[in-house]
């Protein structure tokens, strides 16, 4: 949000890690603006686009381009567009959760692909930088829990999930559970950007 000038930048991650825990600040960026930012995404062209409807359409256009050609062009393997759309939709419904591959498959309508095919499709989405999962983590070095825990599911930008779910700012304001999960994903996206 800072890069799109929607954050004040008052709180510094560097200062927090250096021990300065005196955090204060105020922003007039309200919940409606947050819902819009979730659906618009952080795409450079969308951030500077003054026409709201055009800015909101960019993530959906990206998804369609991805499904129509990009996902097949990257390695020359022809993938089933319907399966890819259903996988992305399931991924969007499971955003910010530790959904396993079997959960994603069970969430698909109709006959899901085999476990190997699903793994290939998820790997293709990751290699195309469409998804960017947060690895399982446990503070105890020898804990087996981290080995058994699925990563937390995230798209590289939560607007992809909004596009796949046909979510609009208005719909998100009427579904605060989905709003919260997408907001969590946006926070992860921004923290990753700030950390780089």
Walk through the language-model features, giving the residues of each.
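Accessory nucleic acid-recognition modules appended to NTPase machines
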Residues: 47-196
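Amphipathic alpha-helical "lid/sensor" segments that cap RecA-like P-loop NTPase cores
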Residues: 18-65
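Conserved small helical "lid"/interfacial subdomain of P-loop NTPases
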Residues: 1-17
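Short polybasic/polar patches that bind polyanions
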Residues: 6, 38, 106
């Amino acid at each position: 949000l800072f890069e799109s000038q929607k954050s004040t930048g008052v709180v510094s991650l560097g200062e927090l890690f250096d021990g300065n825990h005196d955090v204060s600040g105020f922003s007039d960026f309200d919940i409606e603006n947050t819902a819009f930012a979730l659906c618009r995404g952080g795409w450079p062209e969308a951030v500077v686009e003054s026409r709201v409807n055009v800015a909101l359409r960019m993530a959906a256009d990206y998804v369609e381009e991805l499904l129509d050609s990009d996902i097949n062009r990257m390695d020359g393997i022809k993938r089933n567009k319907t399966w890819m759309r259903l996988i992305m939709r399931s991924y969007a419904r499971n955003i910010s959760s530790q959904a396993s591959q079997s959960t994603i498959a069970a969430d698909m309508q109709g006959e899901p692909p085999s476990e190997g095919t699903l793994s290939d499709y998820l790997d293709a989405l990751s290699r195309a930088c469409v998804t960017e999962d947060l690895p399982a983590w446990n503070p105890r070095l020898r804990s087996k829990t981290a080995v058994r825990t699925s990563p937390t599911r995230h798209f590289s930008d939560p607007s992809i999930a909004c596009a796949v779910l046909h979510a609009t700012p208005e719909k998100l304001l009427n579904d605060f559970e989905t709003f919260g999960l997408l907001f969590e994903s946006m926070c992860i996206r921004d923290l990753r950007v700030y950390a780089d």
